[in-house]
Every structure is written in C-alpha cells, then in structure tokens.
Amino acid sequence: MTPTIKPGQDFPGVGVGLAILRDGRLLLCRRLKAPEAGYWNIPGGKVDHLESSLAAARREAEEETGLTIGKVEFLCHSEYINVADRHHWVSLIFVTRDTQGEPVLTEPDKLSDIGWFDPDNLPEPISA
C-alpha cells in the first residue's frame, strides 16, 4: 500500500489568497478547518496541479464567496510554518477591487461566517 502524501504536511504546500476590497472594506471569511480553524482570513486555498496561482485565487474566491471576480493582481507572498503540527505552506496573495454580486456563505462545511471589515477594525483572531 502506498502511503498518502499530503501537501503542506509532507512537503511545502502551495496556497493562494485573494484580498477583495470594496468601498474601503476588506472581505474576510472565518475558517472551520485546521490549520486556521476559528480564524478570519481572506478567501483562498490550495493550488491544484497544473493550475496557475492566479486562476486558483480566482477559483477559490468565487467558490467561497459566490462573487464574480474580475481583474486580479499579484500583491505579495506569505509563508506559514508550524513545526509542532508539521504544517508548511507558501501562499501567493493577490488583490482585486473588481467584483460583481454580494458575498454569500457558499461553503458552510469550510466557513462559518463571511463579512466586510474596515481595515482599521479587523475581527479577531485573524490569520496572517
């Protein structure tokens, strides 16, 4: 039997996030699953094999929020390492101000809440 190899645990995983801005506010989702359970974060997730990071950011954000995402630009990268839990992720972060629709909680098995927040008054706990 071949052992299961998991990205982010057995080797560094590649993730993406999309900072969605509208009217001076940032859209955040509250996660239900480890390693960020209970934390607020921008929409995002794993990059699928043979998928570009930009396409993954758009896909994950549309899946998690129900929004239609327009123009997306690269913003920065982040790295999460938790030795105790054996988690290691490198994430590419993108930004957009180009969306249509209103956000809805489309993945209640992964997210417990979604909302717009003033960048000077973000909810806690928040994930980097």
Language-model segments: which ranges?
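Short Pro/Gly-enriched beta-strand edge/turn motifs at strand-loop
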Residues: 1-4, 75-77
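Conserved N-terminal beta-strand and adjoining loop/helix that marks the start
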Residues: 3-26, 93-95
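A generic structural micro-feature
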Residues: 8-12, 39, 84-90, 108-111
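Short loop segments at secondary-structure junctions
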Residues: 23-25, 32, 97-102, 119-121
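Conserved Nudix-box catalytic region and its N-terminal flanking loop in Nudix hydrolases
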Residues: 25-63
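A short coil-to-beta-strand element that immediately follows conserved catalytic motifs
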Residues: 68-76
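Active-site-adjacent beta-strand/loop module that shapes the phosphate/pyrophosphate-binding cleft
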Residues: 78-103
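NUDIX/MutT-family hydrolases
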Residues: 93-95, 104-128
